[in-house]
A protein has these predicted regions:
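Glycine-rich phosphate/diphosphate-binding loop of Rossmann-like nucleotide-binding domains
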Residues: 1-24
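A generic "binding-loop/recognition-motif" signal
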Residues: 10, 67-68
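Short, structured active-site "lid" loops
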Residues: 44-66
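A short beta-strand-loop structural module common to alpha/beta enzyme folds
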Residues: 27-40
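Short, conserved beta-strand edge motifs with alternating hydrophobic and charged residues
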Residues: 6, 29-32, 60-64
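Loop/helix-junction capping segments adjacent to catalytic residues or to phosphate/diphosphate-binding pockets
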Residues: 12-13, 38, 42
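Short helix-capping segments at alpha-helix termini
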Residues: 22-27, 56
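Short Gly/Thr/Asp-enriched flexible loops that form oxyanion-binding sites at enzyme active sites
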Residues: 69-73
Length: 73
């Protein structure tokens, strides 16, 4: 399974820990990190959603401070 992961700055620590754990999982063939230090939650939400819609990944995982922003975006 290919997974895109993304987070704005306030979710970076959790995102990094999850990406590391996913990379160790034998069921996951690729973890695509679409984050940058200055990215906002709407931007990263759109990038992860687009990666799923275009078929570049099978699943998307978004992390932010509360989850509300990424859910709305």
């Amino acid at each position: 399974m290919r997974i895109a992961i993304g987070a704005p700055g306030n979710g970076a620590l959790l995102k990094d820990a999850l990406a590391e754990r996913l990379a160790e999982d034998g069921r996951v063939s690729d973890v695509l990190d679409l984050s940058t230090p200055e990215i906002t939650y709407p931007e990263v939400s759109f990038q992860v959603a687009r990666a799923v819609a275009e078929g570049r990944v099978d699943r998307g995982l978004l992390i932010c401070g509360t989850g509300v922003g990424t859910a709305i975006a």
